[in-house]
Amino acid sequence: MTDLLRAAGAVVWRGEESRPEVAVIHRPAYDDWTFPKGKLKTGEHVIAGALREVHEETGMTVRLGRALPPVHYFSRGRLKRVDYWAGRMVADDGFVPGEEVDELFWLPAEEARARLTYEWDAGLLRALAVAPLESVPLVLVRHGSAGARNEWAGEDALRPLDPEGASQAARLATALPAYRPEVLMSSPSARCVETLVPYGGGIKVEPLLSEESQDPHKTPVLVGDLTVAAAVCSHGKVLPALIHALSGKDVHLRKGAFAVLHRLDGRVVSVERYTT
């Protein structure tokens, strides 16, 4: 639906996972109590939009956990979709009351449910409670668009991103901060390395992620042994088998897309797929 309004936000939490507190905001224009969210800017990645809106409305930086069910409702005659995530507060620049948001309270889930204006927000709290809040994200990325293989005269491993692929890499760089990866790993192919470069340096090149050297046993062990948040870029011929080996899920990614595998004690508890 081309007329669909898009927005994004998060249920921001802090404290112990067994008894978290969530951030509830008051919007004077609507006189409602809700969770931080807002409309996406033109061309903005939905994950980047969620990070931005949370920071603008609360002053907080969050690390996103698993996605929560999206909310749909009509706003001024147009259907609106709001994507939400669980978001652990990792930094706080301080809440500044303003015209859009004038109050913020940290509340236990039970008190937050009683304070919230909308039933769909109460539904987000219920979704928050049914699965672990803390997880270790593994972001598996298919390299961006790199033109046609048969139109490249040089060595295939040197084939670079094309303009569309560069744009995809730039959008990926706005989404990856949500997961705060400590390890960046890539196939040696230029198009894979270039897909991660806009996010940051320190990329470890790993031949087992290449099309030529992938191994159905060694490659999943290599990636599965990562115990911290990580982003890994590889190929369309490598990633489906890798994702299945790690999660048991059949996930196919178009160029520039990525899957987020949320892991708890080494076990994948949730798989999400996003485009750029």
Which residue ranges define each predicted feature?
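Conserved Nudix-box catalytic region and its N-terminal flanking loop in Nudix hydrolases
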Residues: S18-T61, N150-P160
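Generic beta-sheet signal
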Residues: L138-V139, L226-S234
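N-terminal strand-loop-strand
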Residues: M1-F35, L138-H143
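Domain-level recognition of soluble alpha/beta enzyme cores
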Residues: S247-E272
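Unchanged
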Residues: L40-R66, P70-L124
